């Protein structure tokens, strides 16, 4: 039978609950426990699939095609365990389910209320993850901050959860902030005390406190916090600001988080094996020469919009003993100022996914620059589509060529709508989503990188390469190196004779892991590293 851990947050938003939950998952897995993590998001959207990246950040896609919160990406990367649509719960999806049940008559004419019906649905979702994941421990992160009105049904649900399982079968972990006041020269505990007081007023007494701070917490302060908040001093776990999110599990292990959780859950504290993770962090902190990578996007003002892409680049750099020198380039600035001025000196260019017209011409200009300057390039989703448009306009001479998404009346729709998408009306959850197989061409760069003939990748798109232009594409020096098993859909392209020019319709960033980087990103960083000076004299020559 599964045990349950609930992670709440107080004082401020974005305090790092997701990283704490993911880190705890890593620590439990290092002791041999099977783990699943789910996120309860208190917004009324059914899922984040139709939300603006500027408001929500990245949409992370699971194997089974759920569009979810970016925290699920952290869960997967830290635990190296695939999550599913069951691991993402929103207030919108909960209410939708309850209302659908009411319309079907499932409640036998009863009055439908927040308690017990909404809270009961939330509890059922948590139990469903436990039943379907075969996990020893299910960790649930509650979005928002204690005190928010939106989070109240979730907090009530996890309070009620005590009645579903034994007291030794669940633990409450509260993440809080200890702000430092410079004029008094001390960390302040009052916000934490009030946050715990608010949680207690709902009926939840935290078992463990994870205290964020920008400086060390001494034993005296831990004892004070524990005394005021009703937790043992040993259950006050410091969480000092870290130089990398991948260092957080190591810090929380030293602080005793996992041991305290296991103690509350009456589980055995097996020997932890974090050696490979610690080695990874050491490599991250002691990298080799830096590679300059330009990420050319539409949403660069909010870095979280491309979170998995950035993490995939980091994973590849760790593997290649390189430091990542990431340059955020707004595609619209390239439209205004030209590609050369913004991209000159870059060792690699990445064009990630996106939707809509804005910034597309800037992406196309960046791809042309990478092609002509022979700079390693990787295109993802829209990045592949814009690479095809760049080919059509500048190599094939197809005047006005573009995507039917961007200009439905174009005479050369080199990217067009998938046939099965023709009659789709709703935007949410209706794209080509989730894992699909891709057959690679023997002898291609992609086949060399993957080392396999068939790979499985995650998708999120409606538009695809138009096969009416396939022969012309192949005749102009390009190769279609990955297709769907039936050969109908173009999934991966590359340019022959170029140091590294690959673009895929799928999202390889979702499958990259710290200890298992994705081959397409590893190949990009390896190719970028080849551009670095190989000796001091070469470095002087280049600077000159």
From Swiss-Prot:
CTP binds at residues 13, 148-150, 188-193, 224. Residues 1-267 are annotated as: Amidoligase domain. Mg(2+) binds at residues 71, 141. InterPro entries: Class_I_gatase-like, CTP_synthase, CTP_synthase_N, GATASE, GATase1_CTP_Synthase, P-loop_NTPase. Keywords: ATP-binding, Glutamine amidotransferase, Ligase, Magnesium, Metal-binding, Nucleotide-binding, Pyrimidine biosynthesis. PROSITE patterns: GATASE_TYPE_1 (PS51273). The keyword Metal-binding applies. It catalyses: UTP + L-glutamine + ATP + H2O = CTP + L-glutamate + ADP + phosphate + 2 H(+); L-glutamine + H2O = L-glutamate + NH4(+); UTP + NH4(+) + ATP = CTP + ADP + phosphate + 2 H(+). It comes from the Bacteria. GO terms for biological process: 'de novo' CTP biosynthetic process; pyrimidine nucleobase biosynthetic process. Its EC number is 6.3.4.2. SUPFAM superfamilies: Class I glutamine amidotransferase-like (SSF52317), P-loop containing nucleoside triphosphate hydrolases (SSF52540). Allosterically activated by GTP, when glutamine is the substrate; GTP has no effect on the reaction when ammonia is the substrate. The allosteric effector GTP functions by stabilizing the protein conformation that binds the tetrahedral intermediate(s) formed during glutamine hydrolysis. Inhibited by the product CTP, via allosteric rather than competitive inhibition. One of its GO terms (molecular function) is CTP synthase activity. It is an enzyme of class 6 (ligase). The active site is at 381 (nucleophile), 507, 509. GO terms for cellular component: cytosol. Pfam families: CTP_synth_N, GATase. UTP binds at residues 13, 188-193, 224. PANTHER family: CTP SYNTHASE, CTP SYNTHASE-RELATED. Catalyzes the ATP-dependent amination of UTP to CTP with either L-glutamine or ammonia as the source of nitrogen. Regulates intracellular CTP levels through interactions with the four ribonucleotide triphosphates. Belongs to the CTP synthase family. CTPSs have evolved a hybrid strategy for distinguishing between UTP and CTP. The overlapping regions of the product feedback inhibitory and substrate sites recognize a common feature in both compounds, the triphosphate moiety. To differentiate isosteric substrate and product pyrimidine rings, an additional pocket far from the expected kinase/ligase catalytic site, specifically recognizes the cytosine and ribose portions of the product inhibitor. Homotetramer. This is CTP synthase. It comes from Synechococcus sp. (strain RCC307). The lineage of its organism: Bacteria, Bacillati, Cyanobacteriota, Cyanophyceae, Synechococcales.
């Amino acid at each position: 039978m599964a045990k349950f851990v609930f992670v709440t947050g107080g004082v401020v938003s974005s305090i790092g609950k997701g990283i704490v939950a993911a880190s705890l998952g890593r620590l439990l897995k290092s002791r041999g426990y099977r783990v699943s993590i789910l996120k309860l998001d208190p917004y009324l959207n059914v899922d984040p699939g139709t939300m603006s990246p500027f408001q929500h950040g990245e949409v992370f896609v699971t194997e089974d095609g759920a569009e979810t919160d970016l925290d699920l990406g952290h869960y997967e990367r830290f635990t190296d365990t695939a999550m599913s649509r069951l691991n993402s719960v929103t207030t919108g999806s909960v209410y939708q389910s309850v209302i659908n049940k009411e319309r079907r008559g499932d409640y036998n004419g009863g009055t439908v209320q927040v308690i017990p019906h909404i809270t009961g649905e939330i509890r059922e979702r948590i139990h469903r993850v436990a039943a379907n994941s075969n996990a020893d421990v299910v960790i649930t992160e509650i979005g928002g901050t204690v005190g928010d009105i939106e989070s109240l049904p979730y907090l009530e649900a996890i309070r009620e959860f005590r009645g579903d399982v034994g007291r030794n079968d669940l633990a409450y972990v509260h993440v809080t902030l200890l702000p430092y006041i410079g004029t008094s020269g001390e960390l302040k505990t009052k916000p934490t005390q009030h946050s715990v007081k608010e949680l207690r007023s709902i009926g939840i007494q935290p078992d463990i406190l994870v205290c964020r701070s920008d400086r060390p917490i001494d034993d005296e302060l831990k004892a004070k916090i524990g005394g005021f908040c009703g937790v043992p001093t040993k259950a006050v776990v410091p969480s000092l600001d870290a130089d990398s999110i991948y260092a957080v599990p190591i810090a929380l292990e030293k602080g005793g988080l996992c041991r305290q959780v296991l103690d509350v859950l009456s589980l055995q504290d097996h020997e932890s094996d974090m050696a490979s993770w610690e080695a990874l962090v050491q490599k991250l902190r002691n990298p080799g020469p830096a590679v300059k990578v330009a990420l050319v996007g539409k949403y660069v003002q909010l870095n979280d919009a491309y979170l998995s892409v950035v993490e995939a680049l980091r994973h590849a750099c760790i593997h290649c003993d390189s430091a990542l020198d990431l340059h955020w380039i707004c595609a619209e600035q390239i439209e205004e100022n030209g590609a050369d001025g913004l991209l000159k000196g870059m060792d690699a260019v990445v064009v990630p996914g996106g939707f809509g017209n804005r910034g597309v011409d800037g992406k196309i200009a960046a791809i042309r620059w990478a092609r002509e300057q022979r700079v390693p390039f990787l295109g993802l989703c829209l990045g592949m589509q814009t690479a095809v448009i760049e080919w059509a306009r500048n190599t094939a001479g197809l005047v006005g060529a573009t995507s039917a998404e961007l200009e439905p009346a174009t005479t050369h729709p080199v990217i067009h709508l998938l046939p099965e998408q023709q009659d789709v009306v709703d935007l949410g959850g209706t794209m080509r989503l989730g894992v699909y197989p891709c057959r690679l061409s023997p002898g291609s760069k992609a086949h060399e990188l993957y080392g396999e003939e068939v790979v499985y990748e995650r998708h999120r798109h409606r538009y695809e390469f138009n096969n009416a232009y396939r022969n012309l594409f192949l005749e102009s020096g390009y190769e279609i190196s990955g297709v769907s098993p039936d050969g109908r859909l173009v999934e991966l392209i590359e340019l022959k004779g170029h140091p590294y020019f690959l673009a895929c319709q799928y999202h390889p960033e979702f499958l990259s892991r710290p200890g298992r980087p994705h081959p397409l990103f590893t190949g990009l960083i390896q190719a970028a590293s080849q551009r670095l000076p190989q000796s001091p004299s070469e470095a002087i020559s280049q600077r000159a």
